[in-house]
Amino acid sequence: MKSKRKDNLSDADLAYKEELDTLVRQLIESRLEDAAAQPILQLLVEHATRSGGNITSVPKALQFLIEHKAALYDLYSAHMSGTGDDSYSVVLLLELMSFLDAIATPDDATEDQKKPAKEADKFKLMLYKVEAVMAARRMLANPATPAEVREKIASRKIQDWGNEYLTSLSTQIVAFFNLPETRDVYDSLPRSSDQMDVVAAEKQSVLQKFDTALLIPETLKFAEEITDYFFQNGFEYDAIDLLLEVDLIESIRRKCGNDHDLITRVTSYIISISAFGATYVETRRMLVVAYEMLLEAGRSAEALRIALKLDDQEKVRDVIFGCTNAATRRQLAYICASHGKYLSLAEKGGAESVLTPEDLDEIRGISSGEHLSGFFLILATELDVIEPKAPQDIFRSYPATKLNANFNITDGRLSKNMAFDSALGNLSHTFVNAFVNCGFGTDMLINVPDSDWVFHHFEYGLLCAAASVGLISLWNVEEGLSKVDKYEYSSNPYVKAGSYAAYGISSCNVVPESDPLSGLLLDKLETPDKTLCLGAVLGVAFGYAGTQRESLLEYLVPIVVSDETQYPHECSAMAAVALGLIFVGSGRQEASEAIVQKLLDLPDNTMDMPAKCQFACALGILQLGRMDASEVVIEALKAVEGEHGRIAELMVEACAYAGSGDVIRIQQFLKCCASAENEPKAKEAKQDADDAMEVDIPPKSPKQSAIDAAVSAVKNASETGGHDTKKEVKPARVGFKLDDDTSSAKRSVVNQSSVAILGIALTALGDSVGCAMLLRLFEHPLAFGSPCERRAVPLALALAYASNPSPQVIDALSKLTHDVDYYVSMHAIFALGIVGAGTNNARIAIKLQNLARSHTRDTTVTFIIRIAAGLLHMGKGTTTISPLHSEGLLLRKTALAGLLVTMTAALDMKNTFTHSMPFTLLFVAPAIRPRWMLTLLPNLEHVQVPCRVGNMVETTGTVGKQRRISGFQTHQTPVLVGASERAELATEEYVPCTTVLEGIVIVEKNDNVTMD
């Protein structure tokens, strides 16, 4: 910054400049040892630190003093080359030089100073200050120093030089700590406060010798003093950033005191920036600091959410046992239940425990989730959606197709004369019926008197139909078991297998104290019947998901490693998935070793690729969220030859970093997609394009398709006056072939690029910025990627935006539904269902109706459209399958695992959903939960409270108390809360026991408010 020219100065400015120039001239003519130097320096310091003038411009004193900076440095150098004695004048001069360096600009530098400088010259501001502090400390340690000087030195504070100076000093401190050599020395130093209080016995100068080991403790003390000032004056975000850079994040705890609002702002900021930690260790340190601050402040609900995010069982126990308020303790149990964390707490020894055995039983009961069904029916009653819906209500505006010809429901039961044309048509109605009525316990298709709908299916269709009974009775274990019981005694093995799966589905996210599943299913896992074993495996997978039950290893591991002659690949794959769901995120060694061994034994070809992908998915689920701890498994997978080995590697890596927002991992997945080895050959690409064009034109001859054969049989039966269609028509098998061409069996629509695309979405999950960038990231694969990459993009978007119908995502998927690639369009249709699952989104509903009109002759696409419609209307618009909760802070691993199984199967849905593995659609069950806010009194009785629900507004890092919602509407609880919405109470009569109003919220009467 150039000093103002004399021609541009007013008379007052000229006089002021002359006064300052005279003071500097007198100082230079004297020596620092002289008594006259001290008052001159005090006057200069007063002028420099005097505030005045416009806040947008530099004070005039600094504008006039800056040109004397070189002269002041020469004065100090002359002193040091002379006696070099410490004095109060030296301290003032060094501080003044440091202050002038803070406002210096490149224009102020001389030609010599503009040359490449030494490392020390980059930190003059910091070095001058360190030199001044060291000189002052030596004077205080010297007994000969006068008391008056001691008092003056002790009274000087770092904040005396103003905010701008502190900001400049903190910037240089951060730059100093970012030097590699500084980090090396810092890591080798002992982390104790004693090292900061050591006074050098001999005189040292950091200006003459750039001593990193000496500078580190001094700059750390500066950081502590600066952040103390920042916290006291409302600059807590700057203070947190500085402490993070100098690795002193733990010191935040003692700087906040008991200020409730300050703790709220600080912890919210720490939690939000923890996602951007360079390493998992750094992220964990930040979260632990926030946890300890909240726990010390008695904010148990917020501390519990951090403990759940850390996945630390001990911290969860500490929060529970440390909570003395009974209502808050019940609220903590409800939070754990919504997270899928069952609290199997034992009594804590010692006097510190305040919980009685009755309290522990109550906590265990609430966290088991057995309350969910009853409260959900209260929600349904209040919203007037308790009446069951039929699939025909969903398809009312759909055109008549081969899949719904002659389908009628009258008076709540099936017509005796109804004719069913295909297994796919029946199966689509079964899934839609189950999704729409899930959790309500009643429907108009299966659970009605004299209904034989379950038997209008074939093989795995029978299994899915029987299993759907459990989905209808979701969360209600007792009612579910009673309704499923009659199917267990069927003579058809597929129906019996479906009943076993239904037992588990009805127990999803519920841990009943009696554990009826162990008696019903465990002995079935050892049955020689492969179909029954598959059903039992599915039931165990659903019923024990996330329970970490070790006793199940001895049942499931032998099925996983078994030969194909013992169990088909589908059964072994589902056993592996069951292990993954039960031990999700634990990295259980026995389960991981079994799956890796199975992958090693599988042949290197593209046959049975859907099952191989499920093995890879199961292994990834075991490593969900384990980050660097999964490296051992990834290294072991390098020994697996073939495409399925590379798929497993990428799947494990994607799951290990799920929800981390790790940009480096996303770049690695993009690099995998761009690698030359994953680019399809031109011949294969052309063949894929030909296949896509061919599938869009279905065969016209009834002999070319099992569906047309079934339709012809139905028509003939009706023309001849046949009445018992069940005897005259055999339903078509799920997974019919459109032609006899086996060339497509040699090629797989799934490769490692497909998994890499899913990995990008998994990594970005939960990060709002990362998810928003997905649309941009996927533009390149859609435009230039291989067919496998393009086909995975819609599913990746659906995975990141499950039950979150963002307009931008809906627009992108709507365009892809008309893609020239048959598989891309089919995947986009299914993705629309996942994105809108449980929301009744009108835009998606209209889009699916239009698509149904466009694909009336394509039975496979029509089936997918109906599945998407069923997902869209899931729970009559009261549920969600998003794995995120607590305003996006927490990730339900069990929900994400189940969703990932379905999405992995969807990569090749023609060979899974419509062929050999339609039951993979049922794996959305662990992800289903109500999207609600329901209020209870401390005695757990339901109470209606006025509340506001609006769009979520991010207030972290903002000044003041901003509104946390916008565009809100006022309702009475219970209310529905969307993915991007937030709720808050609209009355002061009640006080919630948690700050996040989501799920089940306990409210207490506010005794400080008098109602009129």
Locations of regions flagged by a protein language model:
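Extended alpha-helical assembly domains of large eukaryotic scaffold proteins
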Residues: 2-996, 1001-1002
